Amino acid sequence: MLPSIAKHAALHQVNPLKKHGQNFIFDSSLCDKIVRASNLAENSRVLEIGPGTGGLTRSILQKNPESLTVIETDERCLPLLNEIKEYYPNLNIIKQDALKINLTDLSCDIVNSVGFAYKKREAKPITNRRANDIGESKAIDYKVTIISNLPYHIGTELVIRWLKEARLITSMTLMLQKEVVERICAIPSTKAYGRLSVICQLIAKVEKCFDVAPTAFYPPPKVYSAIVKLIPLENPLSIALINKVEQITKLAFAGRRKMIKSSLKNLVPNIHEVLTQLKINDNYRAENLAPQDYLRIAEIL
């Protein structure tokens, strides 16, 4: 039988390191609650970033996934994770920096690791809104479910990267800084609404699940955390269109209090005509436009 999460970490002398952005969770009931929020189905293929001392890892494995692949950069955690693997052979451990992982390649590795043979579906019609601008005329039959307590310093970057590969993802249930979760879920004309809100909501259905107090971690961070769930929409946007939305929102929200016709004039000289054609009030500010408004601007450019 495995020791408790805290005792297991102590036995391996694994203490949280600031350089890795580590704040460990030793409360198994909280880990179970996170997994419940994901609605993880049996026989899913799961990805976890930064398992650390393996608390969330254990809770995921107890749900009988087909496989769980964990990405860990801290060598000190590997012996501990390998001990968990002795009880759960469907655990795959990869020592790597999460920012260097390509989800497309990783998904193929996950499939191969469980001997999963997939069939190619009949290709669907390609549109500029579907993620087919990189030659993806063949639909992908395998997807991963991502469940992770993400390091704060790379969390937002990972979310954006994964959203660009949404066709490979069933859902993402993530622990992030509470402020970041509020930005992901924010509605127009609110203080938290911004670029992250627009991009996330154009690609996925987003839902804040619950807050997590600093006292749930060791050591306690200075801020609250929260759990957010993102479920990619059925027809993901193309990479080209996402990049265009990123470009537009970067300009728009750089001058948050400027009118949109002023913020975007360097990108689109005839911005007044474009906004008029789309029936968007050109006196609106960046925070007043809904995600779909930004998408319509991107599509017409």
From Swiss-Prot:
InterPro entries membership: KsgA/Erm, RPE2, rRNA_Ade_diMease-like_C, rRNA_Ade_Mease_Trfase_CS, rRNA_Ade_methylase_Trfase_N, rRNA_adenine_dimethylase, SAM-dependent_MTases_sf
Binding site for S-adenosyl-L-methionine: 23, 25, 50, 72, 97, 149
GO CC, any one term: cytoplasm
One Pfam match: RrnaAD
EC number per UniProt: 2.1.1.182
Annotated GO MF terms: 16S rRNA (adenine(1518)-N(6)/adenine(1519)-N(6))-dimethyltransferase activity; RNA binding
Broad class of enzyme this protein falls into: transferase
SUPFAM superfamilies (UniProt xref): S-adenosyl-L-methionine-dependent methyltransferases
Statement: the UniProt record of this protein carries the keyword RNA-binding: yes
SMART domains with a match to the protein in the record: rADc
Catalyzed chemical reaction(s): adenosine(1518)/adenosine(1519) in 16S rRNA + 4 S-adenosyl-L-methionine = N(6)-dimethyladenosine(1518)/N(6)-dimethyladenosine(1519) in 16S rRNA + 4 S-adenosyl-L-homocysteine + 4 H(+)
Alphabetical keyword list: Cytoplasm, Methyltransferase, RNA-binding, rRNA processing, S-adenosyl-L-methionine, Transferase
Subcellular location: Cytoplasm
Family: Belongs to the class I-like SAM-binding methyltransferase superfamily. rRNA adenine N(6)-methyltransferase family. RsmA subfamily.
Role of this protein: Specifically dimethylates two adjacent adenosines (A1518 and A1519) in the loop of a conserved hairpin near the 3'-end of 16S rRNA in the 30S particle. May play a critical role in biogenesis of 30S subunits.
Name of the protein described by the UniProt record: Ribosomal RNA small subunit methyltransferase A
Organism for this UniProt entry: Rickettsia peacockii (strain Rustic)
Taxonomic lineage: Bacteria, Pseudomonadati, Pseudomonadota, Alphaproteobacteria, Rickettsiales
